[in-house]
């Protein structure tokens, strides 16, 4: 069978995809805290800035819809002030996990709804629903665990990674030409933007977010043991019709055991933070 030599574009496409998939991240230096390894090379297939811009647009639309229903909490709302105070304590520790976080325009908002839900979109756009706070009767330590978990998804760029994997499955000369600036990749990312709120993460992503969130909360002075009580509450609340947050955040004994196994790594950070 006659074979044809690869074109320059095909060679470039092969090299680009290989680099993205095999990209070895620099080994993490010995550090205190949890060990979740390096970010996936798939994320490099999608520009971070485009994802963050799409997220910001979707976030703005969500807040406008909530405001039109009188469901967006005003700045003086006690629970919103509480959330923003906790966020202010967590965010300074985000930069270690993702240097882009330094330039993010962080936002924290509260929407009145019975939904047991919360999220942090790429670029640091955080939303909590009143249902998750009120129905679970969350302590500050437990709020910090949820917020840390959601921030961790953004810091570890799990949404970008998922989109990168989707790109990789259909990659070809046309897609690669877009990645090389020869096409309109922005349109592809914009199409993904409408799906950002509906993305579900893998079990690996969820475990990683649990641990990174655990460390963020500990460094900010919130008790890591609240990660256990939080998931006990979540498990109890999931009986019957599971809440939306749990439908994309699988809970269970394995998850609690994983947190307990990592407590010795983060308790010293918490104790140091408490001492000031």
Predicted stretch roles:
Residues 2, 21-276:
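A Zn2+-metalloprotease active-site environment signal
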Residues 2-16:
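Bacterial N-terminal signal peptides that target proteins for export
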């Amino acid at each position: 069978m006659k074979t044809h030599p690869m074109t320059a574009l095909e060679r470039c496409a092969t090299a680009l995809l290989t680099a993205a998939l095999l990209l070895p991240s620099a080994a993490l230096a010995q550090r205190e805290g949890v060990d979740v390894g390096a970010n996936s090379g798939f994320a490099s297939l999608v520009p971070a800035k485009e994802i963050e811009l799409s997220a910001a647009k979707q976030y703005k639309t969500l807040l406008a819809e909530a405001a039109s229903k009188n469901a967006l909490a005003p700045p003086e709302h006690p629970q919103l002030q509480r959330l923003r105070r906790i966020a202010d304590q967590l965010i300074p520790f985000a930069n270690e996990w993702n240097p882009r976080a330094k330039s993010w325009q962080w936002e924290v908002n509260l929407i009145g709804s019975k939904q047991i839900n919360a999220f942090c979109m790429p670029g640091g756009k955080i939303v909590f629903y009143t249902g998750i706070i009120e129905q679970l009767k969350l302590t500050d330590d437990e709020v910090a665990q949820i917020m840390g978990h959601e921030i961790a998804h953004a810091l570890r760029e799990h949404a970008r990674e998922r989109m990168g994997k989707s790109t990789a499955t259909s990659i070809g000369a046309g897609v690669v030409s877009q990645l090389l600036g020869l096409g309109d990749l922005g349109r592809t990312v914009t199409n993904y933007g409408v799906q950002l709120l509906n993305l579900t993460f893998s079990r690996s992503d969820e475990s990683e977010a649990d641990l990174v969130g655990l460390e963020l909360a500990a460094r900010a002075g919130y008790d890591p043991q609240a990660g256990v009580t939080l998931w006990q509450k979540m498990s109890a609340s999931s009986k019957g019709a599971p809440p939306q947050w749990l439908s994309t955040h699988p809970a269970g004994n394995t998850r609690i055991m994983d947190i307990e196994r990592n407590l010795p790594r983060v308790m010293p950070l918490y104790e140091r933070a408490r001492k000031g």
